[in-house]
Curated annotation (Swiss-Prot):
The gene is dnrI. SMART domains: BTAD, Trans_reg_C. The lineage of its organism: Bacteria, Bacillati, Actinomycetota, Actinomycetes, Kitasatosporales. One of its GO terms (molecular function) is DNA binding. Keywords: Antibiotic biosynthesis, DNA-binding, Transcription, Transcription regulation, Two-component regulatory system. May form, with DnrJ a two-component regulatory system for daunorubicin biosynthesis genes. One of its GO terms (biological process) is regulation of DNA-templated transcription. It comes from the Bacteria. PANTHER family: TRANSCRIPTIONAL REGULATOR REDD (PTHR35807:SF1), TRANSCRIPTIONAL REGULATOR REDD-RELATED (PTHR35807). Belongs to the AfsR/DnrI/RedD regulatory family. This is Regulatory protein DnrI. Residues 1-100 bind DNA.
């Protein structure tokens, strides 16, 4: 079974969809898939479905949702009874386990590629690192589990995945800056800073890319825009690192034009 969660939920076995259609069974399946190969306790499933106010019939209702998910698995397996499905979605002491190899999920593939990119970066293999980061990001088809109603537990996991995605994106930007690909990054960094108007790492990378592309005045304007946003929204000044970057650009510090450690180390922050 292949399960993809970095975008709309898609689960299939030999070309047959296993993705539940109804909202609650879809929610149950998603939480089990996020923890594939691990027992998810019944209280955790109830918490995801109903929060702190489960109905009196919560356990019976959960069992009904489990049965609905198993029916979908049965269809995909081409079986005429529930035996194989019960082996895939197993009842365990205190909970349920989706017995699917975690390597058959796009979440696992994303995290593996991101780790490979980090290791390549640490070895100085920047072309390989950039390629691995790109491959990891290419697995995303939209926001994680965008079509699944998320309770607290799925919501927390989605937030973790989205933060990891942003971290890998920062790492890829830094790697490409170190490879001298600043001009090609400008459209993407322009869009990213608009989407994340207070994210200092992205703004620093944008400023460096602009400066190295011969657009120094726009790099300084970017700093002014960031500062205005931070002051107006949070009442704080940009970090010392951003201010040092601005001063380096103002005095035409030759170090800012070289590929290397002058680029903000997003990879070490995002993937540590």
């Amino acid at each position: 079974m292949q399960i993809n969660m970095l975008g709309p939920l898609v689960a299939h076995h030999n070309g047959t969809s296993v993705t539940p259609i109804a909202r609650k069974p879809r929610q149950v399946f998603s939480l089990l898939a996020l923890q594939a190969g691990t027992v998810v306790p019944v209280p955790a499933l109830m918490d995801e479905l109903w929060g702190t106010q489960p109905p009196a019939s919560a356990l019976t209702t959960l069992q009904t949702y489990i049965l609905q998910v198993r029916r979908g698995i049965t269809v995909a397996l081409g079986a005429s009874h529930n035996g194989p499905a019960k082996d895939v979605l197993r009842t365990c002491y205190g909970g349920y386990l989706l017995d699917v190899d975690p390597t058959n999920t796009d979440v696992y593939a994303f995290e593996r590629l991101a780790e490979e990119g980090k290791r390549a970066c640490e070895r100085g293999e920047l072309d390989l690192a950039s390629a691995r980061f790109r491959q990891a990001l290419d697995l995303w088809r939209g926001d994680a589990l965008v079509d699944v109603h998320a309770g607290m537990r799925i919501g927390m996991e989605v937030a973790r995945l989205e933060e990891s995605r942003l971290g890998v994106l920062e790492a890829r930007m830094e790697t490409d800056l170190r490879l001298g690909r600043h001009a090609g990054l400008l459209p993407e960094l322009s869009a990213l800073t608009a989407r994340h108007p207070m994210h200092e790492n992205l703004w620093a990378q944008f400023m460096i890319a602009l400066h190295r592309s011969g657009r120094t005045s726009q790099a300084l304007e970017a700093f002014i825009k960031l500062r205005k946003t931070l002051v107006n929204e949070l009442g704080v000044e940009p970090s010392a690192r951003l201010q040092h970057l601005q001063h380096a650009i103002l005095r035409a510090d030759p170090g800012i034009d070289r590929n290397g450690p002058e680029v903000p180390a997003a990879a070490s922050v995002a993937l540590a």
